[in-house]
């Protein structure tokens, strides 16, 4: 459920000082986990302002802004442009956080969409040149389980979080071993990298006329599987993604070992996000709520279907076989989400 945060004291003054905005209206907007977001109306039009205060995340938010601007400069209209401050900066400091303003994107988050629509958009981003781009590149590392283990030893971690981790101890160890295995396989080939979003399906918007893809905080130079792994348990969807990117000029074939790697990696990435957020939460009540969310994530969440598919592929190579079968089977397009 999306939270709506109140308007902080001084935000209007900051926007006027840093951006020269004459505000007509400001109101909380739907936001993700880390960012506090507001819709602002000015004499020049409407914008979104997003503030990230989290010590464990705000620097990645700051680092993503030049990449967002590069994408927008490349003619990608569905990625809202970053609005520069009066001094030409892409962000400013506010109450210990990073504040940035974006062009207004009308519409709402799509709970359901055709993968052809999403990957038709992403293909335009994948087609952008990346040589000389100052962007972190994928290394297919496998150290993240150790990071999670270190965070789990923090004395201030709530008991509820410790209990949740103990209940999944054997599964966590198995996933760590699988991650190490696929890390070793994937590190042998670091070719065919593109600008990837990292959570595209959760940030795909539409107003019925056009699409928007927002929140590029986790942008990275990586293979397309970094975006596609969420469809790991649905070979027909992977088939549709494959066909869509190829039809849009991206000469690449999805690789099952990379899909497996990201399934295991993101299990730990989300876990690390929970643990880091619990430990850096400004309020004890907020930390307790995140601990409860982490317990629910570990107990039963959408990611286990992807992990089950990856596990099956390790023992039976069933993912590669089912994906190959899906490629041979004509996939009827679900049609565009747009009317």
Model-based region annotation:
Residues 1-84, 210, 319, 323-326, ...:
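Conserved NTP-binding catalytic cores of kinases and kinase-like/nucleotidyltransferase enzymes
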Residues 189-194:
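Protein kinase catalytic-loop region centered on the HRD/HxD motif
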């Amino acid at each position: 459920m999306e939270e709506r945060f109140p308007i902080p004291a001084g935000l209007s003054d900051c926007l006027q000082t840093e951006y020269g905005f004459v505000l007509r209206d400001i109101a909380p907007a739907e936001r993700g986990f880390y960012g506090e977001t507001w819709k602002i109306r000015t004499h020049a039009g409407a914008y979104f302002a997003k503030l990230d205060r989290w010590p464990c995340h705000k620097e990645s938010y700051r680092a993503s802004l030049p990449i967002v601007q590069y994408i927008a400069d490349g003619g990608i209209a569905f990625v809202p442009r970053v609005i520069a401050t009066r001094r030409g900066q892409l962000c400013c400091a506010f109450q210990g956080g990073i504040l940035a303003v974006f062009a207004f994107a009308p519409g709402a988050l799509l709970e359901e969409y055709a993968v052809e629509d999403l990957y038709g958009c992403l293909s335009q981003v994948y087609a952008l040149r990346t040589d000389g781009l100052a962007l972190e590149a994928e290394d297919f590392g496998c150290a993240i389980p150790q990071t999670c283990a270190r965070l789990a030893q923090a004395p201030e971690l709530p008991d509820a979080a410790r209990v949740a981790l103990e209940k999944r101890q054997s599964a966590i160890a198995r996933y760590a071993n699988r991650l190490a295995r696929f890390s070793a396989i994937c590190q042998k080939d670091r070719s065919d990298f593109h600008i990837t979003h990292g959570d595209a399906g959760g940030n795909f918007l539409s107003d019925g006329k056009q699409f928007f893809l927002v929140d590029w905080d986790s942008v990275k130079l990586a293979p397309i599987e970094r975006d596609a792994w969420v469809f790991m348990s649905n070979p027909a969807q992977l088939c549709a993604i494959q066909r869509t990117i190829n039809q849009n000029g991206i000469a690449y074939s999805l690789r099952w070992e990379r899909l497996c790697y990201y399934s295991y990696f993101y299990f730990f990435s989300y876990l690390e996000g929970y643990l880091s957020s619990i430990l850096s939460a400004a309020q004890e009540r907020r930390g307790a709520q995140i601990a409860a969310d982490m317990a629910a994530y570990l107990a039963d969440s959408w990611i286990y279907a992807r992990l089950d598919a990856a596990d099956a592929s390790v023992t039976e190579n069933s993912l590669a076989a089912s994906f190959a079968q899906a490629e041979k089977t004509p996939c009827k397009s679900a049609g565009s989400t747009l009317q």
